[in-house]
A protein has these predicted regions:
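A mobile "lid/hinge" subdomain adjacent to the ATP/sugar-phosphate binding pocket shared
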Residues: 233-266
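Short glycine-rich phosphate-binding loop at a beta-alpha junction
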Residues: 74-85, 296-305, 405
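Short beta-strand-loop/turn "lid" adjacent to the catalytic site in phosphate-handling enzymes
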Residues: 69-105, 123-124
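Phosphate/ATP-binding catalytic cores across multiple sugar-kinase/actin-like superfamilies
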Residues: 273-298
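Flexible beta->alpha loop and helix N-cap segments adjacent to enzyme active/binding sites
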Residues: 2-3, 9-13, 17-53, 98-113, ...
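Short, well-ordered amphipathic alpha-helical segments that serve as non-catalytic structural scaffolds
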Residues: 54-71, 282-287
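Short acidic-aromatic active-site loops that bind/stabilize oxyanions
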Residues: 261, 265-281, 501, 505
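Active-site pocket-shaping loop/turn-to-helix segments
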Residues: 47-58, 270-277
Length: 570
C-alpha cells in the first residue's frame, strides 16, 4: 500500500496569522511523507522547497517531491493520512467536507484518514524508536480540538497525552490528556515572547510572522546568562513579574500550581533562567508523578514541541527514571505527517522500515546532479575521486579557521542540521563563534553554536556519558577541555552536542576523524546551512545560492569543492 502523510493548511493562507474574519489561520511546519509497502521513501518539510521559513500552506511541493522519490503518480496513492490541528478554521473545513473534496480530487484512488494531532506526535516517536514495547508522553502547546465529540459546551484541546505500545503484538493505546490552560508548550512560548521583547527593548506582536515560532529557542539560549542566580526552593513557581504573567492565566504557573510571592529580577537574562529552571522542575515533577503511578514504563518515547528543549531533555535523561529514552529528531510539528503516515501503515499491519539513520529522510542527490548545478552557475570547482582525500583537504582548511558549507548524503528531516546540510568551523578559538555569527548567521549574541563529536571521544570532552545522535541533549564540557572547544562552549559550560559514528553518518564522521588527525580535536562547530531567518538548504541549487550569498570560504558538496574567489576575514 502507498501511504502519504501530509500536513498543512488547505483553502486558506496558513502563513498569515489571521484572516479577514479575524479567525486564527497560522499553521507552521507543513510537509509530506511517503511510505510504500511499509518502506519509508521520503519525508520533507515544505519550507525546504518553497524557501519560506516555517511554511504552513498546503504542501503541494512536498507531495510532488515525495512522489518523485517513489516514482509514483497521484493515482498510485492508496491512503492519505492527515493530522488534525488546533484551529477552528480547520475543523470548519473538515465538517464541511472541503478537506476531503480537495484530497479526493488530487488522489482519486485514495482513502482519507484523519489522525489526532497528539496521536501523530506519538507515532513519530514510537515508530522511530529501537524498542518494541514501552510508553509515550506527548507535551506541546496544543493538539487537536476535542469539543466536537467529548465535550459539548466547552472547547478543550489535547495538551498532555500518554499511551502504551507493543509493536510485536500490534498494540497502540492512546489516551489524550485535556487541560484547559497552562500546558507546558504554550506557557513557555508565551513567557519567552515577553522576555525576548524585554531583552531587545522592543515590542513585537506575538503573532509576528518573522518571529512567532522562534521565541522558545532564543530564550532557552539566553537562560544561561542568568545562571549566576542560585535556584533555591523559594524561586520554584515564582512569578517573574506582573508584566510577564501569561495573559490568559495570571495567577498560575506550569501545571496550574499557584504562584509564590512576586520576586524582583534585574533583567531579562535572570527571568529567562528562572523560566527555564521552572520548566525543568515542573517537567521532572510531572514525569516522575506519572512514572510513580505506573502510567509510564521503563522504556519511554517523548514527542511534541516541548521536547525540543534540550535542557529539559537532559534533566529527564539524567533522572534515572527510565532504562531508555527516545526523542525523535522531529518531535515538533515537523514530524506530524511522518507520524500520521507511520500510524496508517501500522493500522494496515505493515512492518515499518526506516533508514538506519532516522534523521536523514530526505533526498540524496547524485554526483551528476551536483556537477550539473555547478556548471549551471559557471563555478570553478575541483572534483575529488577519493572521498577521504576530499576530507583531508577540508580538515586542513577547517584547521585554518575557514568556514565550510557542507552538503552530503540525504537531507535531514527535522529542525536541526545534523551534518548533511551544515556550516562547519574549528571549535577551538572562542572568536570563531563571533566570526561565524557576524559573517554568516547574524543571530543574537547569546545563542550558542552546537558541536559534532565522534561518539568514541564523547567521554574525553563531556561529563555526561550518554549519546546524542540528533542534537537533542545538552552536555557539560569538562573543565580541562573548555578552552579546546571554546567556540561551542556556552557561558554555563554546556554544549548542545551531536554524537556521530561512521556507521550512521560516514561522510561527516570521516571528516571529523581527518580533522582530529590535523588538529588533535575530534569535534567541529556545527550550525545549519542557511542565513538567519531562512530555511536550511535542501537542493544543490539552494546550497550554491547560499554559498554565493553568504560570506563562507568553501562549499564542499558531494565530491566537489568550490572556493570563494574573494575571501573576507574579520
Amino acid at each position: 500500500m502507498n501511504i502519504l502523510g501530509l500536513y498543512g493548511g488547505f483553502d486558506w493562507d496558513a502563513n498569515k496569522s489571521f484572516n479577514e474574519h479575524q479567525d486564527l489561520t497560522w499553521t507552521h511546519d507543513a510537509g509530506a511523507t511517503l511510505i510504500s509497502n511499509g518502506n519509508h521513501i521520503s519525508s520533507i518539510s515544505q519550507e525546504r522547497l518553497t524557501r519560506i521559513k516555517y511554511d504552513g500552506n498546503f504542501p503541494q511541493e512536498s507531495i510532488d517531491y515525495c512522489l518523485s522519490a517513489g516514482n509514483l503518480s497521484y493515482e498510485d496513492i492508496d491512503l492519505i493520512c492527515v493530522p488534525s490541528m488546533c484551529l477552528t478554521i480547520w475543523y470548519k473545513q473538515y465538517y464541511e467536507g472541503t478537506i476531503t473534496k480537495k484530497l479526493t480530487s488530487l488522489f482519486p484512488n485514495a482513502k482519507i484518514k484523519f489522525v489526532s494531532h497528539h496521536l501523530s506526535h506519538a507515532a513519530s516517536a514510537v515508530f522511530s524508536c529501537d524498542f518494541n514495547e514501552g510508553s509515550f508522553l506527548v507535551l506541546d502547546g496544543a493538539g487537536s480540538l476535542l469539543y466536537s465529540y467529548e465535550f459539548k459546551d466547552t472547547q478543550h484541546v489535547e495538551t498532555n497525552s500518554i499511551g502504551y505500545f507493543n509493536k510485536k503484538k500490534s498494540i497502540f493505546r492512546f489516551f489524550p490528556g485535556i487541560h484547559n490552560v497552562n500546558e507546558f508548550g504554550s506557557y513557555y512560548h508565551s513567557l519567552s515572547h515577553k522576555i525576548y521583547c524585554e531583552k531587545i527593548q522592543k515590542q513585537i506582536n506575538g503573532y509576528d510572522e518573522k518571529y512567532r515560532e522562534s521565541w522558545d529557542g532564543k530564550i532557552m539560549g539566553l537562560s544561561a546568562y542568568g545562571s549566576h542566580i542560585e535556584f533555591t526552593e523559594d524561586l520554584k513557581d515564582c512569578q517573574l513579574s506582573k508584566e510577564l504573567v501569561y495573559d490568559e492565566v495570571p495567577y498560575v504557573t506550569f501545571e496550574g500550581r499557584p504562584y509564590k510571592e512576586n520576586h524582583t529580577f534585574k533583567n531579562a537574562d535572570e527571568k529567562a533562567y528562572i523560566l527555564q529552571k521552572n520548566f525543568e522542575c515542573a517537567l521532572l515533577d510531572y514525569v516522575t508523578e506519572l512514572k510513580n503511578k505506573s502510567y509510564l514504563d521503563d522504556y519511554i518515547c517523548f514527542a511534541g514541541g516541548s521536547f525540543l528543549n534540550v535542557l529539559g531533555n537532559s534533566v529527564l535523561k539524567q533522572s534515572g527514571l527510565f532504562k531508555d529514552i527516545h526523542v525523535p529528531p522531529y518531535p515538533n510539528d515537523v514530524g506530524l505527517h511522518f507520524g500520521a503516515a507511520c500510524f496508517g501503515a501500522f493500522q494496515n499491519k505493515e512492518e515499518i522500515n526506516l533508514p538506519k539513520n532516522i534523521a536523514l529522510l530526505g533526498k540524496n542527490y547524485t554526483q551528476e546532479e551536483i556537477e550539473q548545478e555547478l556548471q549551471n552557475f559557471n563555478l570553478d570547482y575541483q572534483k575529488y575521486e577519493n572521498f577521504e582525500e576530499l576530507c583531508e583537504f577540508t580538515a586542513q582548511e577547517l584547521n585554518k579557521n575557514k568556514i565550510i558549507g557542507w552538503f552530503q548524503n540525504r537531507s535531514e528531516f527535522g529542525p536541526r542540521a545534523l551534518g548533511s546540510r551544515s556550516l562547519l568551523m574549528h571549535p577551538g578559538p572562542a572568536k570563531n563563534k563571533d566570526i561565524m555569527n557576524s559573517r554568516v548567521k547574524h543571530r543574537e549574541y547569546w545563542r550558542p553554536f552546537a558541536g559534532i563529536v565522534l561518539e568514541n571521544h564523547l567521554n574525553d570532552y563531556f561529563v555526561e556519558d550518554f549519546c546524542s545522535p540528533y542534537m537533542l541533549y545538552s552536555l557539560t564540557v569538562k573543565k580541562e577541555k573548555k578552552n579546546e572547544i571554546a567556540a561551542i562552549t556556552h557561558v554555563d559550560n554546556t554544549c548542545r552536542i551531536q554524537t556521530v559514528t561512521k556507521e550512521l553518518q560516514p561522510e561527516v564522521a570521516t571528516l571529523i576523524q581527518k580533522f582530529k588527525e590535523v588538529s588533535g580535536i575530534p569535534v567541529v562547530l556545527n550550525t545549519s546551512f542557511n542565513d538567519n531567518g531562512e530555511p536550511i538548504v535542501e537542493t544543490p541549487e539552494d546550497a550554491i545560492k547560499a554559498f554565493n550569498n553568504l560570506d563562507i570560504d568553501y562549499l564542499v558538496i558531494g565530491n566537489y569543492v568550490v572556493k570563494k574567489s574573494e575571501i573576507s576575514y574579520l
